[in-house]
Amino acid sequence: RFRRALYTFWRRTSPHPAMLMFDAQSREACVLRRRRTNTPLQALVMWNDPQFHEPALALGRHAMHVDAVAPARGIAWMWRKCLLREPTTAEVSRLLDLLKDERERGLGEEAAWGVAASVVMCLDEFVTKR
C-alpha cells in the first residue's frame, strides 16, 4: 500500500507527475545535486496525492493512539517523529485548534488527526532538507 513512494515507475520520456512537481531531473543525464525548490504546486501534490495522503492518515492514527486523554502528547509525538524537535506551545495550540475545528466540521476523530498530520507533513521544515 505504501510502496508507491518507493517503487515509482519511471519512463525516460515522461517522468512521474509528482516527481515533475518536485523538480526531479530528467533521466537523460546524471545530476549530482537537485535544486532546492518550494512551490505552491508541491503543496497541492502533498495535499491531494494518495502517495502523501495515506501516510498522513497513518501518522495521524498513530498520534491519536499515543494518548487518548491528552491530544497535546499525540501532537508532540507526531512533531518529534516528523521534524525531530519538540514543538513550541504556539505550534501545539494551533494544531489543537485545528483538531477541534475538524471535529466540529463533522469529521471523525481519525480523519481529524489525519488532517493534522497532513499539515505537519506539508510544512517547509518537513519537505525541505537543509
Model regions and ranges:
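An acidic, gly/pro-interrupted, aromatic-rich
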Residues: 1-74, 109-130
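C-terminal structured "cap/appendage" subdomains that terminate the fold
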Residues: 63-117
